[in-house]
Curated annotation (Swiss-Prot):
This is Tryptophan synthase beta chain. Its EC number is 4.2.1.20. The keyword Lyase applies. It is an enzyme of class 4 (lyase). It comes from Vibrio campbellii (strain ATCC BAA-1116). The gene is trpB. PANTHER family: TRYPTOPHAN SYNTHASE, TRYPTOPHAN SYNTHASE-RELATED. HAMAP family: Trp_synth_beta (MF_00133). Keywords: Amino-acid biosynthesis, Aromatic amino acid biosynthesis, Lyase, Pyridoxal phosphate, Tryptophan biosynthesis. Disulfide bonds: none annotated. It holds the Pfam family PALP.
Length: 396
């Protein structure tokens, strides 16, 4: 029986209760078989094109980098049906679930984007859907909660722990261990127990594949750097995957520095965590001195995650990708700038990557460089959050 590699260097693995091992093995085999089945590939590609709207545009910014010699392109995952890159891999996993004969889907969500994507795929493909969401996130993402319910999903608020994404993840896994015979756990990021990090990456890698073709057609060369925000890391690994072998291209992941990387209110486990076991995998993790999982913090619910996918941990360890961070304030500034000067309202998550690209352009305005930011989602879900912050600052 063919097997996928469970580890990226020392990171990854499958740290789950024994009861879940058969479900994960079944999933791995179904994925391997599906990848070799032209009918599965064809159905997946048809859904991506005719339902989700792929390929997404690669947009050259006209005004953001004025006064510098940087050319900045945006990979427009915000234009995808559902409003973010999440839809790509959700369609793939939902098709896999049907292939395995599962008729129920369990998911977790932070910002609500993965929940919405899961709900739309389940509505389309006739699957039952329940979504676990931290009670705090239910409050700060009410439009997405209503969207999920409109599409027939049951949204289950989680009040335990910090009532955010990590707690929703734990509850979803708990549910799955009782229901795996009928239900598929549709994990939302390139993290968690093997084979999820590999499956999610492969169902997101069209982001980088399209970007490579589009930039070569437009510029006749590869970019100097591709930049993406990193929470769990699926939009970033989707962008990076096709460039890993292209050594001339810098891969830059941007973690949330929250209220400051030297405070205890950030979400940057890659740079400021210690290796531990969390959510079924071995990965960098924000921990207190006693080894307990520390609360992560970010203004954007989708980056508010105390760990990171194992492939990012490996790319960081071997020096192939570099990981920096951006504060809430810098992300909010970039959010306003791109809205004001390009007519695009990005997700707060994606604004972290935009902020980093602008920092690169402005730190060295005379440097000629070609940058691509993965604009992973649109910002409709964030306008109330941003409005409240700007109002408090007296900025509006």
């Amino acid at each position: 029986m063919a097997k996928l590699n469970a580890y990226f260097g020392e990171y990854g693995g499958q740290y789950v209760p024994q009861i879940l091992v058969p479900a994960l093995e079944q999933l791995e085999q179904a994925f391997i078989d599906a990848q070799e089945d032209p009918e599965f590939r064809s159905e997946f590609m048809t859904l991506l094109q005719e339902y989700a709207g792929r390929p997404t545009a690669l947009t050259l910014t006209r005004n953001l980098t004025k006064g510098t010699k940087t050319k900045l392109y945006l990979k427009r995952e915000d234009l995808l049906h559902g409003g973010a890159h999440k839809t790509n891999q959700v369609l793939g996993q939902a098709l896999l679930a049907k292939r395995m004969g599962k008729n129920e889907i369990i998911a977790e969500t932070g910002a609500g984007q993965h929940g919405v994507a899961t709900a739309l795929a389940c509505a389309l493909l006739g699957l039952k859907c329940r979504v676990y969401m931290g009670a705090k996130d239910v409050e700060r993402q009410s439009p997405n909660v209503f969207r999920m319910k409109l599409m027939g999903a049951e949204v289950i608020p989680v009040h335990s722990g910090s009532a955010t994404l990590k707690d929703a993840c734990n509850e979803a896994l708990r549910d799955w261990s009782a229901t795996y015979e009928d239900a598929h756990y549709l994990l939302g990021t390139a993290a968690g127990p093997h084979p999820f990090p590999t499956i999610v990456r492969d169902f997101q890698r069209m982001i980088g594949e399209e970007t490579k073709n589009q930039i070569l057609a437009r510029e006749g060369r590869l970019p100097d750097a591709v930049i993406a925000c990193v929470g769990g890391g699926s939009n970033a690994i989707g962008m990076f995957a096709d460039f890993i072998e292209e050594e001339s291209v810098r891969l830059i992941g941007v973690e949330p520095a929250g209220k400051g990387i030297d405070t205890d209110q950030h979400g940057a486990p890659l740079k400021h965590g210690k290796t531990g076991i969390f959510f079924g995998m071995k990965a960098p993790l924000m921990q207190d001195p006693n080894g307990q999982v520390e609360e992560s913090y970010s203004v954007s619910a989708g980056l508010d995650f105390p760990s990171v996918g194992p492939q990012h941990a490996h790319l960081n360890a071997i020096g192939r990708a570099e990981y920096d961070n951006v504060t809430d304030d810098e992300a909010l500034e970039a959010f306003q700038e791109i809205a004001r000067h390009e007519g695009i309202i990005p997700a707060l998550e994606s604004s972290h990557a935009v902020a980093h690209a602008l920092r690169m352009a402005r730190e060295n305005p005379e440097k000629e460089q070609l940058l691509v930011v993965n604009l992973s989602g649109r910002g409709d879900k964030d306008i109330f959050t941003v409005h409240a912050i700007l109002e408090e600052k007296g900025a509006i």
